[in-house]
């Protein structure tokens, strides 16, 4: 389960992929993502990076739960949904609520940035406004690797790299076709 991630880190079991990348809460993820374009592997990768798949974690900044949602983001996202009764930030520790709101927000930034996981992941971590600013600054002159390296926040830069690799690993674990770390459109786009 989710605690296995921490156990593999403590035990330095770096090659134990199934334990390091558990497929937990998959039914909740699948249910929450019924009308979304994001893949299960991508949503799991975000959750793995955000919380190591621990439901009851809170960041120093106040982000909560599996997908590490800020209460304000959760509230804004819940307003757009009719199938969730979001009343309190404490609900973000409930996997079903956190995953429903987290996958909705992830889908929102994924669509906003033309289904590009590099940009959507950066936006999920640092906010869409910052990503737009970084794109304005790069003026469409950078390939994907240069754009990722140009992200001014070390945390976000590393976050994007980790999420892309984790998505690839989850695709392999879940027996999906994994053709590469980046999609063709992510690789060929200028940023």
Which residue stretches match the model-derived regions?
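Catalytic glycan-binding domains that act on GlcNAc-containing polysaccharides
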Residues: 1-191
């Amino acid at each position: 389960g989710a605690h296995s991630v921490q156990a593999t880190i403590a035990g330095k079991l770096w090659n134990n992929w199934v334990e390091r990348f558990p497929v937990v809460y998959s039914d909740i993820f699948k249910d929450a993502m019924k009308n979304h374009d994001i893949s299960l592997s991508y949503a799991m990768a975000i959750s793995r990076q955000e919380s190591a798949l621990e439901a009851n974690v809170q960041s120093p900044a106040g982000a909560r739960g599996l997908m590490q949602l800020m209460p304000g983001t959760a509230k804004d996202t819940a307003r757009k949904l009719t199938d969730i009764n979001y009343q309190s930030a404490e609900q973000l520790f409930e996997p079903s609520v956190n995953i429903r709101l987290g996958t909705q927000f992830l889908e929102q930034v994924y669509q906003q940035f033309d289904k590009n996981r590099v940009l959507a992941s950066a936006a999920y971590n640092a906010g869409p406004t910052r990503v737009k600013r970084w794109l304005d600054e790069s003026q469409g002159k950078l390939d994907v690797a240069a754009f990722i390296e140009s992200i001014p926040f070390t945390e976000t830069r590393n976050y994007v790299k980790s999420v892309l690799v984790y998505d690839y690993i989850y695709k392999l674990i879940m027996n999906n076709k994994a053709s590469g770390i980046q999609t063709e459109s992510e690789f060929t786009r200028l940023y």
